[in-house]
């Protein structure tokens, strides 16, 4: 039987494009792990995607996942649009490259490793975990906001095409999933 994990994700951006951050909460068997990261120049949609990708990639083995996002972009993309994009060689219906295509491909790969049920939650509506994921996203963005930018060492890029977050933090990690 695969491990059952609950994930809550959010992305944030100051300006669009501008400095941005993402946050994720992973909950398994009474243990909570919080992740966050950010980029100096990005969009809110990229941060929403990176939150989901980073959370799913943090799982060490295939799991049954309930993933909660407040992003209609991520929900529609993963549940509706992605099938056509893949069929069309990662092109839209009008033959243009999919925006954030490298991130969609990374999310597709991460999604296929697990049994994921995707859930949409209304953002900024008092949903406790979504509010915390938003706080984590803002924390991830903070080092890149004007006046507080401190260059961080880049994490090694496992996929040269995939833009990895420059800074990633994990908190309250007592067990690897």
UniProtKB/Swiss-Prot annotation:
Bias (Basic and acidic residues): 126-138
Catalytic activity: Endonucleolytic cleavage to 5'-phosphomonoester
Required cofactor(s): Mg(2+)
UniProt subcellular location: Cytoplasm
Single Gene Ontology BP annotation: DNA replication, removal of RNA primer
Cofactor note: Binds 1 Mg(2+) ion per subunit. May bind a second metal ion at a regulatory site, or after substrate binding.
Signal peptide annotation: none
Cellular compartments per GO CC: cytoplasm
Region (Disordered): 126-177
Coiled coil: none
Top-rank taxon, per record: Bacteria
One of the Pfam families matching this protein, by short name: RNase_H
RNase H type-1 domain sequence ranges: 1-142
Keywords in alphabetical order: Cytoplasm, Endonuclease, Hydrolase, Magnesium, Metal-binding, Nuclease
EC nos: 3.1.26.4
PANTHER family given in the database record: RIBONUCLEASE H1 (PTHR10642:SF26)
Protein function: Endonuclease that specifically degrades the RNA of RNA-DNA hybrids.
Record protein name field: Ribonuclease H
Lineage: Bacteria, Pseudomonadati, Pseudomonadota, Alphaproteobacteria, Hyphomicrobiales
Gene this chain is encoded by: rnhA
């Amino acid at each position: 039987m695969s491990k059952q994990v609950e994930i809550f994700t959010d992305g944030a951006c100051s300006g669009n494009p501008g400095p941005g951050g993402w946050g994720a909460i992973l909950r398994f068997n009474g243990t909570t792990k919080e992740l966050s990261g950010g980029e100096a120049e990005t969009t809110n949609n990229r941060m929403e995607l990176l939150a989901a990708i980073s959370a799913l990639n943090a799982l060490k083995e295939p799991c049954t996942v309930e993933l909660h996002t407040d992003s209609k972009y991520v929900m529609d993309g993963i549940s509706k649009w992605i099938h056509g994009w893949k069929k069309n060689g990662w092109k839209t219906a009008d033959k243009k490259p999919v925006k954030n295509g490298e991130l969609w491909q990374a999310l597709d790969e991460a999604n296929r490793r697990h049994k994921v049920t995707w859930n949409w939650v209304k953002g900024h509506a008092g949903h406790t975990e979504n509010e915390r994921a938003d706080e984590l996203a803002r924390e991830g963005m903070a080092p890149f906001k004007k006046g507080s930018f401190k260059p961080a060492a880049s994490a090694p890029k496992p996929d040269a095409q995939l833009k990895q977050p420059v800074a990633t933090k994990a908190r309250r990690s007592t067990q690897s999933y």
